A protein has these predicted regions:
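Active-site-proximal loop/helix segments of hydrolase catalytic cores
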Residues: 1, 6, 10-29, 109-218
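Catalytic cores of large soluble enzymes that bind and process phosphate-bearing ligands
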Residues: 14, 60-68, 214, 218, ...
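Flexible, acidic/histidine-containing loops and adjacent segments that form or flank the divalent-metal
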Residues: 20, 24-158, 236-246
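An exposure/low-complexity boundary signal
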Residues: 43-47, 161, 224-228
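Class I S-adenosyl-L-methionine
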Residues: 73-77, 172, 223-227
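C-terminal regulatory/interaction regions
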Residues: 216-246
Length: 246
């Protein structure tokens, strides 16, 4: 589409559906800056994981994402780019009239994630321990997501990655107020609840959902909850929600 430059790319967290496509885009147009959630030089100590030890598709995908994370970071630096790990509390002007507020992860969360990553790789030679830690980190990874609130000329946009309802701890409730909410975790059942909807009070909700509903994305209960709070719903590819016109 004629895009010749990427000033900024954001990797919210290390899961296949959020990172592997970003690597493909970066190979075409390497970004000048990469935001992600780990110490910028940690990737250098991560050796490639052997996906053949995976016992199921989830483990295989997660190992691929971890490998692609290292490849992405190396690609950015090899092309003269900068890797950053924004922290909660920062507010950055990234373009005229556009500011980004970093809501999560906190320094504590970033350190915890780095510790989990290091422990995982240090156990790679003990298959049973490695796979146990792999599954545990996979289950927790969503709530290590980078959470951003954009403000463009007074319109606030909340982008929580795959954060579920338990992952907003430590964030000032006032900072969650937004006009547009990209519902977390693809609109699955744990992507929003009554309390979160009351805090955000969005007028519009965007849900990025898979069409096969394999992971129960765009869950009807979640969509109805947000619509009942007055939000207009905008969805990607997913089947109609019974009883609703989307």
């Amino acid at each position: 589409r004629g895009i010749r430059r990427l000033d900024l790319a954001v990797s919210t967290h290390i899961h296949e559906d959020h990172l592997c496509g970003l690597l493909r885009a970066a190979r075409i147009t390497p970004p000048a800056v990469l935001w992600q959630t780990l110490p910028p030089d940690l990737y250098r100590s991560l050796r490639p994981l052997d996906g053949s030890v995976a016992r199921n598709l989830s483990e295989s995908k997660f190992m691929q994402a971890l490998n692609d994370y290292g490849t992405l970071c190396a690609l950015v630096e090899d092309h003269g780019g900068t890797i950053l790990a924004p922290k909660s509390g920062q507010e950055l002007v990234i373009a005229p009239d556009l500011t980004v507020q970093i809501l999560s992860p906190s320094t504590k969360k970033q350190l915890a994630l780095a510790d989990e990553i290091n422990a995982l790789y240090n156990s790679a030679n003990v298959c049973s321990t490695f796979l146990q830690r792999l599954d545990a980190l996979d289950a927790r990874m969503n709530n290590y997501s980078l959470i951003l609130r954009l403000n463009y000329r007074g319109t606030r946009i909340l982008l929580p990655g795959d954060t579920n309802v338990t992952g907003y701890d430590g964030i000032d409730p006032a900072d969650l107020r937004a006009d547009l909410f990209k519902v977390g975790h693809h609109g699955q059942k744990d992507g929003a609840d009554e309390a979160l909807a009351e805090l955000i009070r969005p007028t519009a909700v965007v849900c990025c959902a898979s069409s096969d509903r394999r992971y129960n994305s765009a869950h009807p209960d979640t969509m109805k909850l947000l619509a009942d709070h007055g939000a207009a719903l905008y969805l990607s590819v997913c089947p109609p929600v019974p009883g609703m016109q989307i």
